[in-house]
Amino acid sequence: LKIYDRAEIAAGQSRYQILRQPKFKSASPMLNDRRGDIMLLINGMPLFHIELKNSGVPISQACEQIRKYSKEGIYNGIFALVQIFVAMTPQKMLYFANPGEWEKFNDNFFFSWADFNNEPINDYRQIADKFLSIPMAHQMIGFYTIADRSDGTLKVMRSYQYYAASAISSKVAKITAQKRWGSENRGGFIWHTTGSGKTITSFKSAQLIANSGDADKVVFLIDRIELGTQSFKNYQAFADDDESVQDTNSTRTLITKLKSTNSSDTLIVTSIQKMSKIKADGTNSHDLEIINNKRVVFIVDEA
């Protein structure tokens, strides 16, 4: 039984529906039942919940209403499947991941959507066209949310993180399609400020590339060993249940992982120090040839 396939976007068995004024059964006999505004369904599953307010009403009221619904326990049963909340007025929009528990709602993670140049998009018609339509809505659920095991909450990417990760994975796909592996000038830079979520961006970029099959190895390269330990823990926390992130405790382990044909060795976290020692550690020419014949993407932290 296949319930959902994140790759079947506007294709295959994916079906999209709009649910108006869904009725929520109260979890307490002391509280009234509630009615929401709009839900977006994929294969019958309510994955987006949208709360609307009129012009002139602060968007914070829509956010608070969603928080209130969560506190009252209405997001249970099938409604526990809601992944992304959207609060909207005709002139303003905020979106945020469902944290599961109402106490975990955090205004710092309520985001506005923006275009590729980071210009905010707030008009409801553009939001409907650029964010809530297919394929974007399906992509956001399937590829640009992360279940973070470190704090037990769902995270959704900001718009600039989406554009960065998408651009990186698209670049690799283009190189593969054009058979340009081995040529020069195939890299690029993504500028992130402190606190802007570069770890999630780098992980999602690596994950998208690994899952696409456009590269044999994706190596997250850090410049300090202590950073590698933290990055490995972060990557492990972000990875899907069927994904494996490989650490490297020595240069020899790194060489083994790079040579491996096992799919579980695709995502690798290592340090510049270990990478620089590959030849110095007496790597034989046969091993180097095996590694050189692989399609390897390096994602460098704080380059």
Roles of regions detected by a PLM:
Residues 266-302:
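Conserved RecA-like ASCE ATPase "motif II neighborhood" in helicase/translocase motors
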Residues 1-217, 226, 230-242, 267, ...:
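ATP-dependent helicase/translocase motor core
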Residues 94-97, 254-259, 279:
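Short, solvent-exposed polar/charged micro-motifs at secondary-structure junctions
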